[in-house]
Amino acid sequence: MSELRETRLEKANALKEQGQEPYALRFDLTDRMARLQADHADLAKGAERDLKVSVAGRVMTRRVMGKLAFFTLADETGTIQLFLEKATLGDSFAQLSSLVDAGDLIGVHGILRRTDRGELSVKVSKWEMLTKSLQPLPDKWHGLADVEKRYRQRYLDLIVTPQSRETFRRRAMAVSAIRRWLDERDFLEIETPVLQSEAGGAEARPFITHHNTLDLPLYLRIATELHLKRLVVGGFERVYELGRIFRNEGVSTRHNPEFTSVEVYQAYADYNDMMTLTEQLIASVCEQVCGTTRISYQGVEVDLTPSWRRATMHELVQEATGLDFTSFETREAAVEAMRAANLPAPDKADTVGRLLNEAFEHAVEPNLIQPTFVLDYPQEISPLARKHRSKPGLVERFELFIVGRETANAFSELTDPLDQRGRMELQQERRAAGDVEASGVDEDFIQALEVGMPPTGGLGIGIDRLVMLLTDSPSIRDVIAFPLMRPEG
C-alpha cells in the first residue's frame, strides 16, 4: 500500500510540474450522469450528438489501448463512459493515460456519442484533474468484503457499493417523509436539550458528562419525552422532535449507543389515536420510499398496509405458552409455571408483571413478523404511562413489532402529577438499589404536570430500525453512516 501511495504522490508532483494543479478549487458542471443517460437514450449506436457537455466525478475503471482509452466516470447519480483518443486530445492524452488512476476525481468537456456496442459516452475534448487520490480503491469486482471495514471506512463503502449509497438515500427520504407527514397535519417540530440535568423518559443507562463552569453533572438525553410533554403543558397541542438519542448500553445488530428517534405528542388523544397515527404514518413513509406497502425483508414478505393486528400482551403470551398470567397471585406462582414451561425467570424480574414481560420477550417477540400492536403493559415497567381505564395493574401502552423487532412505543400519557410522583419515587428506589436503568424524580417535570397537562397521546418511533426494514438491512450498522466502533489495535 505504501508503494502505491508513493507512486501516486509522484504522479501528483508530475502534474504540478506540467502545470496541472492536482487539487482544484472548482469545476463548472453542466450535467449529471443519470440525466445524460435519460435524456439521450435515443442516440443511435455509432452516432454523435453535437452537444457540449461538462461532467465531473470519480474514475472507477480505466482501459488504455494504444491511442484510445475508455474510463468509467461516476458521480452521485450514476456512471458514464469516457471515450478518449489521442487524435482529439493531443499531448494531454499521454498525460491522462499515465497520470490518472482509478479513484481520481476529474472533470471533462466534450460531446456525446454512442459506441458501436451501445454505450453512451462522452467524447472528451478537454480534461482537468480535480483531486488526485493517493489511496487505491478496493477491488472493483469484490468491493469491501470485510464487513467491519465497511463500517470503519464508510467513505470507501459508499464509493464502491451502490447498495450502500441507496440505503442512505432511502434513509434521507424516510426522514423527510416523516417530517412532511407530521408537518402537513399541523404538528410542530421543536428542539429540546441534548444535555440534561436529569436523565428521564426511558429505562436506560445514560452517558454522564460534566459542565466545568457550572460544576454540574449532566446527562446526554435518553429520550425527548419529558421536555416535549412540558411543551404540551405550555400549549403546543401537536408537537414532535426527530433527533439523536444516547444510551450507554450494548452494541448489537439492533442497538447502537447513538441512534435516532421521532417522538410525537398530540393533546386530547389517547393510545388508540396513536395506533391509527402510527400505522398511517409508517405506511405512508413506506409507500414514498419503496413505492409500495408490501415489501420483502430478509426473504420474508411483510405487508404494511393498514389496518394492523392488535392484541394484548396477556393474550399473546397465553397463545404462545399456555400461561395465563392473570391467574398468578404471587411471583412465586409465576416463576414455578414459567420454569415448567422452560421459560427463564430471572431474579431481576421481581414482580408478576416483569415476569410477564420476560415471557413475552422470549416466547412471543421473535415471532411477530407482520406488524402487530402489542397492548396493555404491566404498570411497573411503564412509569410514564396512564393507568388502564378498565384493567387494574396495567397501563394504556402499546409497542409496535415488525419482523420480530420493537419499532415504536406509545402511551396514553400519565397526566396525574401525584401518580407520576409516586411512580418516579419507585424508580428512584430501584436506582438506589443498583438499577442503573432506573430514573429519579424530576421535580421540574412534576411541577409542570401540576400546572396541568391535557389528556395526551405520545409516540416514539425508532428511525434506524424503520430504515432497516425499508432497506432490507440485517444490521443497524448498515443504516447508520458512521456507527460506533471499538478503536482498532
Curated annotation (Swiss-Prot):
Subunit description: Homodimer.
Organism name: Synechococcus sp. (strain CC9311)
Sites where the protein binds Mg(2+) 2: 406
Subcellular location: Cytoplasm
CC per GO annotation: cytosol
Pfam families (alphabetical): tRNA-synt_2 (PF00152), tRNA_anti-codon (PF01336)
Bound cofactor: record note: Binds 3 Mg(2+) ions per subunit.
NCBIfam families, sorted: lysS_bact, PRK00484.1
Listed CDD domains: LysRS_core (cd00775), LysRS_N (cd04322)
Catalytic reaction annotation: tRNA(Lys) + L-lysine + ATP = L-lysyl-tRNA(Lys) + AMP + diphosphate
HAMAP family: Lys_tRNA_synth_class2
EC number: 6.1.1.6
Main location: cytoplasm
Cofactor: Mg(2+)
InterPro entries recorded: Aa-tRNA-synt_II (IPR004364), aa-tRNA-synth_II (IPR006195), aa-tRNA-synth_II/BPL/LPL (IPR045864), Lys-tRNA-ligase_II (IPR002313), Lys-tRNA-ligase_II_bac/euk (IPR034762), Lys-tRNA-ligase_II_N (IPR044136), Lys-tRNA-synth_II_C (IPR018149), NA-bd_OB-fold (IPR012340)
Name recorded for this polypeptide: Lysine--tRNA ligase
Gene Ontology molecular function terms on file: ATP binding; lysine-tRNA ligase activity; magnesium ion binding; tRNA binding
GO BP term, example: lysyl-tRNA aminoacylation
Keywords, ordered alphabetically: Aminoacyl-tRNA synthetase, ATP-binding, Cytoplasm, Ligase, Magnesium, Metal-binding, Nucleotide-binding, Protein biosynthesis
Residues that bind Mg(2+) 1: 399, 406
Family: Belongs to the class-II aminoacyl-tRNA synthetase family.
Gene expressing this chain: lysS
